[in-house]
UniProtKB/Swiss-Prot annotation:
InterPro entries: FucosylTrfase_pln, GDP-Fuc_O-FucTrfase. GO terms for molecular function: glycosyltransferase activity. Residues 82-573 are lumenal. The chain crosses the membrane at residues 61-81. Its EC number is 2.4.1.-. This is O-fucosyltransferase 20.
Amino acid sequence: MALSKNSNSNSFNKKKVSYISVPSQIINSLSSSSLQSLLVSPKKSSRSTNRFSFSYRNPRIWFFTLFLVSLFGMLKLGFNVDPISLPFSRYPCSTTQQPLSFDGEQNAASHLGLAQEPILSTGSSNSNAIIQLNGGKNETLLTEGDFWKQPDGLGFKPCLGFTSQYRKDSNSILKNRWKYLLVVVSGGMNQQRNQIVDAVVIARILGASLVVPVLQVNVIWGDESEFADIFDLEHFKDVLADDVHIVSSLPSTHVMTRPVEEKRTPLHASPQWIRAHYLKRINRERVLLLRGLDSRLSKDLPSDLQKLRCKVAFQALRFSPRILELGNKLASRMRNQGQYLSLHLRMEKDVWVRTGCLPGLTPEYDEIVNSERERHPELLTGRSNMTYHERKLAGLCPLTALEVTRLLKALEAPKDARIYWAGGEPLGGKEVLEPLTKEFPQFYNKHDLALPGELEPFANKASVMAAIDYIVCEKSDVFIPSHGGNMGHALQGQRAYAGHKKYITPNKRQMLPYFMNSSLPESDFNRIVKDLHRESLGQPELRMSKAGKDVTKHPVPECMCSDRQQQEQQSDA
């Protein structure tokens, strides 16, 4: 009897709310007669009536009936919940997966097949209700705001007020059109970007005109892109017109001049060292060619030169129009449903080779990495005397997919968070990313988001692909790199300059002991890891707090100031 009444109650509520826990496919498969047989008891015979007339006089039957009525009342009260208080599943039960949708655009083709859920999805009346536990509290709703909450920027804003002496020197420097600096930049796109910044500063130090830097073909990626293929050349010239004279090529008067080539610029070279070693030579030969500038110029420069660094990195180096257009489109597709997180995952084969680390997948993959490293020992970057385990414990290795997943869960990233992942194809293929895709199914890269044919013009252009990743990551609400590197450093400074947008720096060295402690309860692990990152969320950090910090990574205080400081600079101008 209790079962039939409870079914009747659910049938009645079905007309009013959409959180019926019975899937609609089952309900629709039942005929009206079948439903009736569930809800209505068969007629009793007269013999049964006589039995009932006897039974109602029995006190035990009365107590039993009262118990059933009370039980039914409690059940009805427990299930008759206000539907507004129930969070509905965003992904209703369905026999087919909905495709990616971008406001009416064609569906995108997935490159690695990693997108598990549609970006755009709507609920329906046959969605199953998500039952709230822990006293009815929805933990996702309580913690989601904390994850997306932006750090306090303390009122710092971009301010590049150059001194009167700098502006005075500019007049004579810009008139000088007889000596030229040629620079060849190497590495990946973000590494080349850093060297272009330093090339502009060195040209300013020498009082020379700068020929648009030459991008050296990378031995790993083989990208033959030129400066104008990646960056907006005319914008680059216009923004720096008051600082350095920039030309696309050597003038005819200097074409036949054999440039003096220099490859041995030391690490952390100061402006005084640059002038002492290069000024006489460029004045005499009129053309100086520099190579191997990566991290050669000192990070600690006079204030005006630091501001020039910021001006180049954050204002002058804008991507070319076609790259910017596609990058903005992909970012818009991620933004369609609100906030999104971007990850820079460093799990490519060359990354494991260069870092001296192992992917930890299978012995076969470890052997692939070790063999490649033995064949090309020059690819290993620094500290070659350290073992893999020593590097791992020192926090020098990229986080694996499982480690990134545990970090995100500890930081209380919502399970339905939309995640854009940047980077090349990981060693081991898409299976390597399964810990992430299982926990966070809305997981996309540029190939998932792009429409058919959109990326074809950039095939085999690693620098262009890196630029597209950069744009989508820069526009995200939260950014997390699995490893340091040039892109992570560039984005840290870019996001700070844009108002200190949230940037989470994984504290790998301090996290690792807890990753390795299998006996630590998950709740304790999450609490500890979250506490380790309270000061690593992209808050303003003074560059001068430690010598050797890059101003394009930490733009405060040389390139950003408070409202009061900005007013003081304007009054001094």
